[in-house]
Amino acid sequence: MQKIIYFFSLLLILGCGVNYDQNLLIAPDLSTQEKKINYPLDINFAVTNNLSDKLGEIRNLSGDLKGEIFLNSLSLDNMQLVIANELRNYGFRISNDKSLPSVEFEITKLSINTGKVAVSYTTELDLEFTLRVKNKGTINQISKNYTNTRQTVRPPEIEANERVLNESISLLLNEVFETDLLQESFQ
């Protein structure tokens, strides 16, 4: 009889231990999880521009309009591509279906100032935008401003300036995605 009680006690102890471990697996520490969409989510995505017919302004530091080398960087297609890639990195699948929840990126300001200061060339990018998420009849939005200054010893080239623009957008979107806007919008 004593052996039977010992055996069932052992099973009970082991059983509790297994349940305890399973509960730990079911409820992990939420503070250590990344703030990303946990499953692929289909969205409609668009970049809009309220800066008339051009995406932004390019000026040198003296104030004169200048900078043909930046024009490729400032194309709406390039912006759409960079932002779409960032959204994909966060687990979104982009679709043209208008019935899906939508993410809209509205550019409210984009300017690049370039010029020579002392012995180095300076590129200043100033980007301001509003990100809107529309889902189930509600609209959540967040506005951000970002300035990125880069100094080089050689005159800037198209590829280098496109990298500055892409990095700026990427950093800015990371800031936005670290807020709860997207998580709340798609719950």
Feature map (PLM): residue ranges:
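Sec-exported extracytoplasmic/periplasmic mature domains
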Residues: 84-92, 173, 177-182
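A structural "domain/chain start" motif
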Residues: 16-77, 182-187
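Mid-chain, structured segments of secreted extracytoplasmic proteins
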Residues: 68-98, 105
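Short secondary-structure boundary motifs at beta->alpha junctions and helix caps
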Residues: 60-74, 138-178
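Surface-exposed short loop/turn segments
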Residues: 17-28, 90-141, 145-156
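Sec-dependent bacterial lipoprotein signal peptides
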Residues: 1-16
